[in-house]
Amino acid sequence: MTTDTSGRTGAPAAAAPAERFRYGFLKGNPQLTKNGELKHLLTIEGLPRAILNQILDTAEQFVSVTDREVKKVPLLRGKSVFNLFFENSTRTRTTFEIAAKRLSADVINLNINASSTSKGESLLDTINNLSAMHADLFVVRHASSGAPYLIAEHCAPHVHVINAGDGRHAHPTQGLLDMYTIRHYKRDFTKLRVAIVGDILHSRVARSDIHALTTLGVPEVRAIGPRTLLPGGLEQMGVRVFHNLDEGLKDVDVIIMLRLQNERMSGALLPSAQEYFKSWGLTPERLALAAPDAIVMHPGPMNRGVEIDSQVADGPQSVILNQVTFGIAVRMAVMGIVAGTND
């Protein structure tokens, strides 16, 4: 577990090597072609600012598709998108499916529980068989960190892979839609204070957000949470660590709340949900400590009365539902960009 013996506000947290912030599965950057184009989206870490801006700019063009009578563009007509969700999801899978269909792709949702993997077939055998069916794009969610990397390394050359969340490692499209939301409301990343609050240790969203925020030039990123829920390595990326919510929220422009990921916890890291809310829940009173025009975000699913008060979640500074709307456009942008590249 992470510990910090200094007791100072803003002091870095220490952690065992297994809990360090950075992951590394393959050498180099397997996401890019030899021409520097995006072939796969596996993680935000290591991507240049130009590619992040390309995705955000492309997403901006797709936002208006939602308001059309016919909500389709022909960009991926004739392409086959396979949603491979080895881990349960409703929101992410649905938005990927909507995004692919709005790009005119054919979408196949694989029922993992009834698939060959539950009959003993290996992950790579499954991927090879699906590649032989002339799949063009795999959208992969998996409980094991690094699974999308393995698939990208071994799938057929014509197949593109998008990571829809792997273990505690990364959730790049969530990170990108968070960046789109921030840019939509705040415009200039270089003048912001952004706070990420809660279970950062187990959060792949937090990792993706921090990599994106630092790449896009945010001058102050704060990680706020109990000592047991903060990973080591944050300070090496320039992140300020706070163990007091009131102090950490002071004057911030963006607040990203995270749920407790009890399914990824081993052992008793926290007291009850009620006690957690008393110390770490975002209430109207605590929100008042932030900048007057601060926005409140949450990747979902929300646990009201645990990490966030309903008055805040439903209040005028909340942009949580807009994140969901923007997520479709961002995933359209990612699929359109990767499926249009050639190695």
Swiss-Prot record:
<dbReference type="GO" id="GO:0006520">
    <property type="term" value="P:amino acid metabolic process"/>
</dbReference>
<dbReference type="InterPro" id="IPR006132">
    <property type="entry name" value="Asp/Orn_carbamoyltranf_P-bd"/>
</dbReference>
<dbReference type="GO" id="GO:0016597">
    <property type="term" value="F:amino acid binding"/>
</dbReference>
<comment type="similarity">
    <text>Belongs to the aspartate/ornithine carbamoyltransferase superfamily. ATCase family.</text>
</comment>
<dbReference type="InterPro" id="IPR006130">
    <property type="entry name" value="Asp/Orn_carbamoylTrfase"/>
</dbReference>
<comment type="pathway">
    <text>Pyrimidine metabolism; UMP biosynthesis via de novo pathway; (S)-dihydroorotate from bicarbonate: step 2/3.</text>
</comment>
<feature type="binding site">
    <location>
        <position position="92"/>
    </location>
    <ligand>
        <name>carbamoyl phosphate</name>
    </ligand>
</feature>
<feature type="binding site">
    <location>
        <position position="204"/>
    </location>
    <ligand>
        <name>L-aspartate</name>
    </ligand>
</feature>
<feature type="binding site">
    <location>
        <position position="119"/>
    </location>
    <ligand>
        <name>L-aspartate</name>
    </ligand>
</feature>
<keyword id="KW-0665">Pyrimidine biosynthesis</keyword>
<feature type="binding site">
    <location>
        <position position="91"/>
    </location>
    <ligand>
        <name>carbamoyl phosphate</name>
    </ligand>
</feature>
<dbReference type="InterPro" id="IPR036901">
    <property type="entry name" value="Asp/Orn_carbamoylTrfase_sf"/>
</dbReference>
<dbReference type="GO" id="GO:0006207">
    <property type="term" value="P:'de novo' pyrimidine nucleobase biosynthetic process"/>
</dbReference>
<feature type="binding site">
    <location>
        <position position="141"/>
    </location>
    <ligand>
        <name>carbamoyl phosphate</name>
    </ligand>
</feature>
<feature type="binding site">
    <location>
        <position position="174"/>
    </location>
    <ligand>
        <name>carbamoyl phosphate</name>
    </ligand>
</feature>
<dbReference type="Pfam" id="PF00185">
    <property type="entry name" value="OTCace"/>
</dbReference>
<dbReference type="GO" id="GO:0004070">
    <property type="term" value="F:aspartate carbamoyltransferase activity"/>
</dbReference>
<dbReference type="InterPro" id="IPR002082">
    <property type="entry name" value="Asp_carbamoyltransf"/>
</dbReference>
<feature type="binding site">
    <location>
        <position position="259"/>
    </location>
    <ligand>
        <name>L-aspartate</name>
    </ligand>
</feature>
<protein>
    <recommendedName>
        <fullName>Aspartate carbamoyltransferase catalytic subunit</fullName>
        <ecNumber>2.1.3.2</ecNumber>
    </recommendedName>
</protein>
<feature type="binding site">
    <location>
        <position position="301"/>
    </location>
    <ligand>
        <name>carbamoyl phosphate</name>
    </ligand>
</feature>
<dbReference type="GO" id="GO:0005829">
    <property type="term" value="C:cytosol"/>
</dbReference>
<dbReference type="InterPro" id="IPR006131">
    <property type="entry name" value="Asp_carbamoyltransf_Asp/Orn-bd"/>
</dbReference>
<comment type="function">
    <text>Catalyzes the condensation of carbamoyl phosphate and aspartate to form carbamoyl aspartate and inorganic phosphate, the committed step in the de novo pyrimidine nucleotide biosynthesis pathway.</text>
</comment>
<dbReference type="GO" id="GO:0044205">
    <property type="term" value="P:'de novo' UMP biosynthetic process"/>
</dbReference>
<feature type="binding site">
    <location>
        <position position="171"/>
    </location>
    <ligand>
        <name>carbamoyl phosphate</name>
    </ligand>
</feature>
<feature type="binding site">
    <location>
        <position position="300"/>
    </location>
    <ligand>
        <name>carbamoyl phosphate</name>
    </ligand>
</feature>
<comment type="subunit">
    <text>Heterododecamer (2C3:3R2) of six catalytic PyrB chains organized as two trimers (C3), and six regulatory PyrI chains organized as three dimers (R2).</text>
</comment>
<dbReference type="Pfam" id="PF02729">
    <property type="entry name" value="OTCace_N"/>
</dbReference>
<keyword id="KW-0808">Transferase</keyword>
